UniProtKB/Swiss-Prot annotation:
Domain Laminin G-like: 82-282
Annotated spans, Disordered: 41-63, 316-340, 424-456
Membrane-spanning ranges: 382-402
Description of how the protein assembles with itself and partners: Weakly interacts with CBLN1 and CBLN2. Very weak binding, if any, to CBLN4. Specific isoforms bind neuroligins NLGN1, NLGN2 and NLGN3. Interacts with CLSTN3.
Name of the protein in its database record: Neurexin-3-beta
SMART domains according to UniProt: 4.1m, LamG
Domain of life: Eukaryota
Glycosylation sites: 181, 279, 323, 339
Post-translational modification, as annotated: Processed by alpha-secretase leading to the formation of an extracellular soluble protein as well as a C-terminal membrane-embedded fragment (CTF). Proteolysis of these CTFs by gamma-secretase releases intracellular domains (ICDs) and extracellular peptides.
Regions of this protein lying in the Extracellular compartment: 36-381
List of residues binding Ca(2+): 134, 151, 233, 235
Signal peptide: 1-35
Amino acid sequence: MHLRIHARRNPPRRPAWTLGIWSLFWGCIVSSVWSSSNVASSSSSPGSHSQHEHHFHGSKHHSVPISIYRSPVSLRGGHAGATYIFGKSGGLILYTWPANDRPSTRSDRLAVGFSTTVKDGILVRIDSAPGLGDFLQLHIEQGKIGVVFNIGTVDISIKEERTPVNDGKYHVVRFTRNGGNATLQVDNWPVNEHYPTGNTDNERFQMVKQKIPFKYNRPVEEWLQEKGRQLTIFNTQAQIAIGGKDKGRLFQGQLSGLYYDGLKVLNMAAENNPNIKINGSVRLVGEVPSILGTTQTTSMPPEMSTTVMETTTTMATTTTRKNRSTASIQPTSDDLVSSAECSSDDEDFVECEPSTANPTEPGVRRVPGASEVIRESSSTTGMVVGIVAAAALCILILLYAMYKYRNRDEGSYQVDETRNYISNSAQSNGTLLKEKPPSSKGGHKKQKNKDKEYYV
């Protein structure tokens, strides 16, 4: 009896590339989760920062923060300007140039946002050093906005005559001066212009020139030319007064984003600039109103400094109605500053619509603005799209790997080593198996073919 050993090949081990597929799959999952967490943290960081700032205001001096709302204009603007509210009893913000840094200018640019209901008051006044007499004043007279300035001879006045501005709405006024020429514009209304008619001194000199001895003509002419040059320069500017209290013409309402020849005076006041003094009924938006009958200190404490927001700030307008005051919140931006810095008149302005906002409690996160909602929604959309794309890619790779694994070669074979094993093995009774001598050639071939087995 022949003992046949059929050896079946062991199943092949899993190829190394399948391990790579699984590594790639888990790598995709981990990377998608990591990227989504980064996007979520980046989108939530501005909100958390603003929440921390509001909590700081509440815990520092227990003020009621004003909700910040962003307008389409503020989305285009750069940095926002600070807003101050001037009460009924009047107030004053006074900026004084250092004695060794007082400018003399041939041209000036002034811009400010305001809202008020008073018929008369001084918004801003710039004065030269004592004894010179040069000044520039922005004021409201009979409900209409105007500017009067004097740079050495007579007062030059320019005014918006068409429409009153004491309607309680928010307006932006811009004034430019170049020598004796001046322009004044309110919002996007038509521009008011002023051009001097001529040099009166030169005209008079030409009339009496022939009566003056010849040897005196040259010195007098040079003196008149030098005087004419001086009449175009605002000499040795010393201080900027905001609010009109020092002149007895009190302004009541709100002022925002004041810009004058590169100085953002209200921002400097909010940042506790040492050259600025504040007294009277003046309150920075976001602070606790002072007790009636008391005045603020002449210098601002550090607690009154405000955080300059990215694009916009809110402004509150106070309107006294039978001992009751209501505040309306309106958005603004530094578009008025940028328009004051450039001389082009083709800039567009969006009319500020008054809107009311309920103040939030200290430490409570403010309502997000339109730009924040857009930024958060776009971040969420990007995160979802990234996760879905990564998951789809991983699923496709996994399906392809499973397909290749199922269609691999599953063939097997068996090996018959009967002849070799029998010739070398012992019988069960201990005797060796003796092969029979081949009887014939045909019988040997038959036996050989009989012992062979083939498997496919």
